Amino acid sequence: MEKIKGYKGFDQNLKCQGFQYEAGKKYEHEGKVDCCNSGFHFCENPMDVFYYYAPSTSRYCEVEGSGDIDRDRDDSKVACSELKIGREIGLNGIIEAGVNFILGKADWANAKE
């Protein structure tokens, strides 16, 4: 089973779309998984989380998605049937994860000058 590491934003109460989450818990969605419509959602690119949750009013966690998977065509948003909420990383953590994500994509051996 494919497991995808990612990041999820929440409101101040650790809710998303009215669903209450808790760090360290795993959740399962019954039914069809369709990105932007149904299933549990998260982003692979930490910076994409800011499209959905503003930095000044949100909380952020590392997550792992698995089960049925559907991907968005516009950004790194993923929908899944199983979502494990990892540790809360806060704003500094999501920014650091974003920098590391970008640096991980750089191909320094073939850098253009």
Could you tell me what each predicted segment is?
Residues 1-113:
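Short, glycine-biased loop/turn motifs at secondary-structure junctions and
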